[in-house]
Amino acid sequence: MTGTAASPGRYTGVVRVVMGEHEFGRIRAGDVVVCPVTSPAWSVVFPSIGALVTDSGGILSHPAIIAREHGIPAVVGTGNATDILKEGQRVTVDGSRGVVEVADSAHR
């Protein structure tokens, strides 16, 4: 899957699909958070996540800017990450190239 390279770095971890702020309690340290987009309310979760993948957004979008501030690899503007990536999948996020690769198809 490809999108916009928004924050450099490479990270491999487990997908956590988060559709909104009401699901923040499900996020665990090191998760690869996959979401439609972020807003300022999401800033509280950035310090603990391993990487970020969003359906929408560009290089100057909120998720891209905040990910860069926190040094978190991020790929934004994938179009359909929340539909394609599944909870518990192991993925590698390459925020330098704008690529998300599924490491395996096993689920937790």
Tell me the role of every PLM-derived stretch:
Residues 1-108:
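Non-catalytic, soluble scaffold/interaction modules
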